Amino acid sequence: MKNNIVLRRGVEADLPQVLSLIQELAVYERAPDAVTNTLAAMQRDGFGPAPIFSFFVLENAAAEIIGLALFYTAYSTWKGRMLYLEDLVVTEAARRGGFGRLLFDAVVAEARATGAVRLKWQVLDWNEPAIGFYRKLGAIIETEWLNGNLDTTQLAEYAVAPAATMAAAPETGSSL
């Protein structure tokens, strides 16, 4: 690998450094207090009985993780199986060394290996370096779709209609 950098699939022991990189990304994205995820939640969600994400890391000779690509399987009703790239981050000191490309290539290879028909991700509209990076790789950066979100408080306060509660119950063979 480049400059004694190793690209590998992430393991549970990487999570403290991964969470640190995620926090570094939040600072870069002007949202330093937005990360509420915890190490325990990442251990449960990535390495529990039903893992919901995977990741690749770049590790230097000092065993420091300098890059991360975290992704998960998603589904497009229009296209089918896809991978969603949640975070692609290289620590600031290692940027512009080709490491983002190594991580992105690994995710593309994973998408191909798992039969995904699409790889999707988000990029902030002001993050020109990232937009340029993705465009250089041949990606189309969409402008017509807006994202909707409900945060933890909104989810808790949302008034669920009785029919929706029934729909979320185990299947009984009846339809709504």
Predicted segments, located by residue:
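Short, charged, solvent-exposed linker or helix-capping segments at domain edges/interfaces
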Residues: 157-163
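Conserved GNAT acetyl-CoA-binding A-motif
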Residues: 112-122
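Structural motif
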Residues: 114, 136-137
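Conserved beta-strand-loop-alpha-helix junction that forms the acyl-donor binding cleft
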Residues: 121-130, 149-153
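Acetyl-CoA-dependent GNAT
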Residues: 5, 9-13, 20-81, 104-105, ...
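A short, internal acetyl-CoA/4′-phosphopantetheine-binding micro-motif in the GNAT/acyltransferase core
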Residues: 88-95
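Conserved acetyl-CoA-binding loop-helix of GNAT-fold acetyltransferases
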Residues: 96-109, 136
